[in-house]
């Protein structure tokens, strides 16, 4: 198919097959897959060379924005919206609309609800696409050797994977006591950025708090850190674990990268992280671990991770001089075959193409465990799904944010936990209201009511009232 597209481009006078395509991303652990696909693409499209630049995550947005403003943007790039929201990038003419290639038949290669106005489509035109299927983005990782050394095993010799808050507490207690100052039950790395909100995602969502660490509870449209008891209960649990010495002592100061290394060396038995950890650990020869997610007060989960339709990752620059060749690389990147190697060979994440996500076809057990968790991410409502004009609502971040507050709770600098959570709710709600007000003043028809879904059952998949294929 790609070959015929390029042949047609060449027949119409295009320069297909005689170009260097500049592409930017910030992926490091996923680099082996990207380089593999570039090699395959270049072999299949002789003469097109993909020149890849990997930028640091911390500087990518600034570099990308400068490149756009100086008319030196790469042909294909990973989308960054830290400074300029995607809808504004489209309005500024930074992104190339892809409709001359991404027609109805191309879009139907993807599952229903992959393309959504206000997310990856604007004015009915396609600008990006999802690469992955939504999945539980954070997991509780268990070092099997640490658990076995502590006697935390089942009758068959497998490790006792914690299912509840009490299970985690018991395991942390046993590991710490038997570790004699060499091994601890729990650990994390908070030195580079506040990472404790990740713990809220895993432990509080399962308790029935759909806002997790970031959003309002969309049943009411309100932020509920101070009014939802689950957040206070988890804060007390966190303080209890710390007070009893279950955490690796330097967790608050070491980086997440160092924490991952310490986990694989058995300095602590449990940590929170994402599937991106697995590739790094495999490179280091560490594969003896298990994982779970959504660990709540009870074994029966009262909430889930919630997904939205659509998705973005890569886009093509409106400045490109090689639109056909840039599209060819974009198309390859999002293809079923590339998705198959993404899942089954390189074990990176779920593919947007469901036929690639069969745990039985994955040989690496920890990644197969992750793929098998996909049912724990279910469709949820969203303001921008209900009203695409919500894309024009810009909500400014607040400080101190949840990560800063949790760090203060952990270190003991914050004594009034309930008051800190309630103050956070007030500031977050104010920022949301201000964002909506500013969008209204700009002429956009948005409302705080867009954030309220009173009939939402958080234990069941939400049915979106949007076209499956626009």
Residue ranges and their predicted role:
Residues 122-134, 138, 148, 166-223, ...:
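Extracytoplasmic/periplasmic solute-binding protein
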Residues 43, 70, 244, 283-355, ...:
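Extracytoplasmic/periplasmic substrate-recognition and gating elements
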Residues 167-173, 215-252:
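Glycine-centered hinge/linker elements that transmit conformational signals in sensory
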Residues 99-112, 156-161, 207-233, 283-284, ...:
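Short, solvent-exposed loop/beta-turn-alpha elements that line the ligand-binding surface or hinge
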Residues 82-139, 290-293, 466-470:
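Hinge/lid segment of periplasmic solute-binding proteins
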Residues 1-92, 154, 161, 337, ...:
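Conserved N-terminal structural module of periplasmic/extracytoplasmic solute-binding proteins
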Residues 292-294, 344-411, 445-470:
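Long, aromatic- and glycine/proline-rich binding clefts that accommodate carbohydrate-like moieties
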Residues 54-63, 83, 162-167, 250-264:
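Short helix-initiation/N-cap motifs at beta->coil->alpha
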């Amino acid at each position: 198919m790609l070959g015929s597209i390029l042949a047609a481009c060449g027949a119409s006078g295009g320069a297909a097959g005689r170009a260097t395509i500049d592409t930017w991303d910030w992926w490091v652990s996923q680099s082996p897959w990207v380089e593999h696909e570039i090699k395959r693409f270049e072999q299949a499209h002789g003469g097109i060379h993909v020149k890849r630049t990997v930028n640091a995550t911390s500087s990518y947005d600034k570099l990308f924005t400068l490149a756009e403003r100086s008319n030196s943007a790469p042909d294909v790039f990973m989308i960054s919206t830290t400074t300029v929201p995607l809808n504004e990038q489209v309005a500024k003419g930074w992104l190339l609309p892809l409709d001359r290639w991404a027609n109805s038949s191309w879009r139907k290669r993807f599952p229903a609800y992959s393309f959504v106005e206000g997310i990856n489509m604007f004015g009915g035109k396609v600008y990006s696409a999802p690469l992955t299927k939504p999945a539980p983005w954070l997991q509780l990782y268990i070092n099997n050797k640490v658990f076995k050394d502590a006697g935390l095993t089942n009758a068959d010799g497998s490790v006792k994977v914690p299912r509840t808050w009490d299970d985690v507490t018991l395991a942390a207690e046993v590991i710490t006591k038997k570790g004699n100052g060499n091994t601890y039950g729990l650990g994390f790395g908070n030195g580079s950025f506040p990472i404790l909100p990740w713990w809220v995602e895993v432990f509080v969502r399962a308790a029935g708090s759909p806002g997790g660490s970031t959003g309002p509870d969309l049943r009411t449209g309100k932020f509920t850190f101070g009014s939802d008891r689950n957040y206070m209960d988890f804060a007390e649990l966190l303080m209890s674990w710390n007070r009893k010495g279950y955490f690796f002592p330097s967790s608050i100061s070491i980086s997440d990268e160092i924490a991952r290394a310490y986990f694989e060396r058995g300095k602590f038995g449990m940590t929170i992280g994402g599937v991106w950890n697995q590739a790094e650990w495999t490179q280091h020869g560490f594969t003896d671990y298990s994982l779970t997610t959504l660990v709540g007060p009870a074994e029966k989960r009262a909430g889930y991770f919630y997904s939205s339709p659509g998705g973005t990752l890569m886009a093509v620059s409106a400045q490109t001089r090689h639109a056909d060749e840039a599209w060819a690389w974009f198309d390859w990147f999002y293809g079923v075959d590339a998705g198959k190697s993404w899942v089954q060979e390189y074990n990176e994440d779920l593919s947007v193409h469901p036929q690639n996500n069969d745990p039985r076809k994955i040989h690496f057990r920890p990644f197969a465990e992750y793929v098998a968790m996909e049912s724990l991410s279910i469709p949820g409502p969203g303001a921008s799904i209900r009203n695409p004009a919500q894309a024009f609502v810009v909500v400014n971040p607040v400080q101190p944010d949840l990560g800063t507050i949790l760090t203060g709770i952990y270190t003991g600098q914050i004594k009034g936990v309930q008051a800190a959570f309630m103050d956070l709710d007030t500031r977050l709600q104010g920022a949301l209201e201000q964002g909506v007000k500013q969008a209204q003043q700009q002429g956009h028809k948005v409302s705080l009511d867009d954030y309220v879904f009173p009939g939402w059952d958080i234990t069941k998949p939400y049915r979106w009232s949007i076209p499956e294929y626009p």
